[in-house]
């Protein structure tokens, strides 16, 4: 196919042909190479410094790619792919990018051998469908058989590559307890785990092992006045997304007064409106008011007199979660549809206790025994802010993984086990097809081996030797029925040997593997379909400015 770079009638250039596809593949590979060395339990971290000097130290694929300022449109597809994996599954962001880039590289080789991209796309789709089916039918194990230990092992596997890998035993138990404490059952009897109801707070100082799990939702706020009660049992909670301040006339309102007494009457009415508003809230039995804005001295006085607790400057995201957990309404204004102010008992949430407690070195507001759904908090300790930020990302990934496993009830063995098994299966499956798709499926099978190879290289082990052993074990498990137990074989990257990873407790959610295969395949196909790139020239901004035009008298009517 000839390569053209021709000017267009519009202000831009058009590139078409093989060079566009090769450029896209090279861009994808360069993104993959950035995150490649951070894969696995012995992967390395990246230090990213942004344009204002903020430093981030992480080996989370999605975070690394989010902080990069990527310009190439094909590379942006991989960045978005990592974000999608992070939102959908929470873990496996690095491996999904590496796999997509490898699929593209091998597809480009086939295109150079004069195989049409449509045949490759068709083959990739067949391979992805067969791979997902094979995982579901042959490579998954139900969690119920393995019990709580399997959940701890899954969290540990997720954390093994992170900065808290040394304390994975401690944190994995904490994460599993936190996830199980926020379990809710819907009317159909299905369990769901809302990990948004787990608030992760960071406080630097002390060691990582002094992090704590607290029953109840912790807020990094304190009561508005020291005269307010610090503990309220059987709390009735109002969640207000506005400030409670003395009512003043709107800007631009002008009042002409001849008599000074009338000015005093206006001030008195302003005070009365504020008092009526506070009494309307307290009249429904509310004794805890959470406000996203400020609370002025006048309002504070009324709350203190009523023996109620007010907490100001609560983050809006926290306020929404508390409203959901306590059954309260998230109120943005007291004004109803008729333009009148109202507040009734149906807008009030309930909790067993709201108290201000000193946890670690900080005063926090703790909301315990929420009525509608449970809530929990994890307070992370670490030597500095970089460490605490990376701990938070690690705990978030582990929580997501545990949630997925608890909801789907299926796990697979980790350490390159799934990829090696699929590689053998798809190679054999490819030979059963008598069409051009056979070549694409064989390349798909070859691409999957990039995960065990990268794991071995990052662990400073002999990748060729280890992957060859792994493939021979999986080949035996698929061809000899008496050796079917070998299907759980994966890599032990510390010892540099092959072992049964199901027994060793290296487990991952089946959903994570299936979704990453689907996402990587779709991303590769999206880039593979492109054979033309039209780039518009940037707008010329060298014209006259508004000030110049005025000075020249060009804008005069």
Curated annotation (Swiss-Prot):
GO molecular function, one term: unfolded protein binding
Predominant subcellular localization, coarse grouping: cytoplasm
UniProt keywords, alphabetically: ATP-binding, Chaperone, Cytoplasm, Nucleotide-binding
Transmembrane segments: none
Family label: Belongs to the TCP-1 chaperonin family.
Localization per Swiss-Prot or TrEMBL: Cytoplasm
Listed name of the protein: T-complex protein 1 subunit alpha
Subunit annotation: Heterooligomeric complex of about 850 to 900 kDa that forms two stacked rings, 12 to 16 nm in diameter.
Described purpose of this protein according to its UniProt entry: Molecular chaperone; assists the folding of proteins upon ATP hydrolysis. Known to play a role, in vitro, in the folding of actin and tubulin.
GO cellular component, one term: chaperonin-containing T-complex
InterPro entries: Chap_CCT_alpha, Chaperone_TCP-1, Chaperonin_TCP-1_CS, Cpn60/GroEL/TCP-1, GroEL-like_apical_dom_sf, GROEL-like_equatorial_sf, TCP-1-like_intermed_sf, TCP-1_chaperonin
GO BP, one annotated term: protein folding
């Amino acid at each position: 196919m000839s390569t053209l770079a021709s000017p267009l009638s519009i202000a831009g250039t058009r590139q078409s042909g093989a060079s566009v596809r090769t450029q896209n593949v090279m861009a994808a590979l360069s993104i993959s190479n950035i995150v490649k060395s951070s894969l696995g339990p012995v992967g390395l971290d990246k230090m990213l410094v942004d344009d204002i000097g903020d430093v981030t130290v992480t080996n989370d694929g999605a975070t690394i790619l989010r902080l990069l300022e990527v310009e190439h449109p094909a590379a942006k597809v991989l960045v978005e792919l990592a974000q999608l994996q992070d939102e959908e599954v929470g873990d496996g962001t690095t491996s999904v990018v590496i796999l997509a880039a490898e699929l593209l590289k091998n597809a480009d080789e086939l295109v150079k051998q004069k195989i049409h991209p449509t045949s490759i796309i068709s083959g990739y789709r067949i391979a992805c469908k067969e791979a997902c089916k094979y995982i579901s039918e042959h490579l998954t194990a139900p969690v119920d058989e393995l019990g709580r230990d399997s959940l701890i092992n899954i969290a540990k596997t997720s954390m093994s590559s992170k900065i808290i890998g040394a304390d994975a035993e401690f944190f994995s138990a904490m994460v599993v307890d936190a996830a199980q404490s926020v379990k809710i059952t819907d009317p159909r009897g299905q369990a769901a785990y809302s990990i948004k109801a787990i608030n992760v707070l960071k406080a630097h100082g002390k060691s990582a092992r002094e992090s704590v799990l607290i029953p109840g939702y912790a807020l990094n706020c304190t009561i508005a006045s020291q005269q307010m009660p610090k503990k309220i049992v059987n709390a009735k909670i109002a969640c207000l997304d506005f400030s409670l301040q003395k009512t003043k006339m709107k800007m631009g309102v002008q009042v002409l007064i001849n008599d000074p007494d009338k000015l005093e009457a206006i001030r008195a009415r302003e005070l009365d409106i504020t008092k009526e508003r506070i009494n309307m809230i307290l009249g429904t039995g509310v004794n805890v008011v959470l406000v996203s804005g400020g609370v002025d001295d006048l309002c504070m006085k009324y709350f203190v007199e009523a023996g109620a607790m007010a907490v100001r400057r609560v983050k809006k995201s926290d306020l929404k979660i508390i409203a959901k957990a306590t059954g309260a309404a998230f109120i943005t204004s007291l004004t109803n549809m008729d333009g009148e102010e109202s507040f009734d008992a149906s807008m009030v949430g309930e909790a067993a206790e709201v108290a201000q407690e000193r946890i670690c070195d900080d005063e926090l507001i703790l909301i315990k025994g929420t009525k509608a759904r449970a809530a929990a908090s994890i307070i992370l300790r670490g030597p500095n802010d970089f460490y605490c930020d990376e701990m938070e990302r690690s705990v978030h990934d582990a929580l997501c993984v545990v949630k997925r496993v608890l909801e789907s009830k299926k796990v697979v063995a980790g350490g390159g086990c799934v990829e090696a098994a699929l590689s053998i299966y798809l190679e054999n499956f490819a030979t059963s097809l008598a069409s051009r798709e056979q070549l694409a499926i064989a390349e798909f099978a070859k691409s999957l081996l990039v995960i065990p190879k990268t794991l071995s290289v990052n662990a400073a082990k002999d990748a060729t030797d280890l992957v060859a052993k792994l493939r021979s074990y999986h080949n035996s498990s698929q061809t000899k029925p008496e050796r079917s137990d070998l299907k759980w074989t994966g890599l032990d990257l510390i010892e540099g040997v092959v072992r049964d990873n199901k027994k060793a407790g290296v487990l991952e959610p089946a959903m994570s593997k299936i979704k990453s295969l689907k996402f990587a395949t779709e991303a590769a196909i999206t880039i593979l379909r492109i054979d033309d790139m039209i780039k518009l020239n940037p707008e010329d901004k060298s014209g006259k400015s508004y000030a110049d035009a005025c000075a020249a008298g060009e804008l005069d009517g």
